[in-house]
UniProtKB/Swiss-Prot annotation:
<keyword id="KW-0165">Cleavage on pair of basic residues</keyword>
<keyword id="KW-0722">Serine protease inhibitor</keyword>
<feature type="disulfide bond">
    <location>
        <begin position="40"/>
        <end position="64"/>
    </location>
</feature>
<keyword id="KW-0964">Secreted</keyword>
<keyword id="KW-1015">Disulfide bond</keyword>
<comment type="similarity">
    <text>Belongs to the venom Kunitz-type family.</text>
</comment>
<dbReference type="InterPro" id="IPR002223">
    <property type="entry name" value="Kunitz_BPTI"/>
</dbReference>
<protein>
    <recommendedName>
        <fullName>Kunitz-type serine protease inhibitor C4</fullName>
    </recommendedName>
</protein>
<dbReference type="InterPro" id="IPR020901">
    <property type="entry name" value="Prtase_inh_Kunz-CS"/>
</dbReference>
<dbReference type="GO" id="GO:0004867">
    <property type="term" value="F:serine-type endopeptidase inhibitor activity"/>
</dbReference>
<dbReference type="Pfam" id="PF00014">
    <property type="entry name" value="Kunitz_BPTI"/>
</dbReference>
<feature type="propeptide">
    <location>
        <begin position="85"/>
        <end position="90"/>
    </location>
</feature>
<feature type="site" description="Reactive bond for chymotrypsin">
    <location>
        <begin position="41"/>
        <end position="42"/>
    </location>
</feature>
<feature type="disulfide bond">
    <location>
        <begin position="56"/>
        <end position="77"/>
    </location>
</feature>
<keyword id="KW-0646">Protease inhibitor</keyword>
<feature type="signal peptide">
    <location>
        <begin position="1"/>
        <end position="24"/>
    </location>
</feature>
<comment type="function">
    <text>Serine protease inhibitor.</text>
</comment>
Amino acid sequence: MSSGGLLLLLGLLTLWAELTPISGHDRPKFCYLPADPGECMAYIRSFYYDSESKKCKEFIYGGCHGNANNFPTRDKCRQTCRAPRKGRHT
C-alpha cells in the first residue's frame, strides 16, 4: 500500500474513532482505572473519569508514569469515557 493510502486509512480510522458514540459496554477499560498522579513532582491540572460517580473529575498529575485515565481537559475526558445522556440532543 502506498504512503498516501496509509495516510488516508489512518485519517479515516481517526475520524471513525472520534465520531463513534461511547456506551457503557464499549467504554475503554482504562476509564475504570483510579486517578494516578504518578511519581514525579510537576503540578499539572488534569482530569480523570470516576466510574463510580460517572463524572470526569480534576486531579493533579505529577508529570510522569501514572496511567491512561488522564486527560488534559474535562471535555477530552468526557469524549473518551462518558456515555452520552439519553433523551438529550446537543
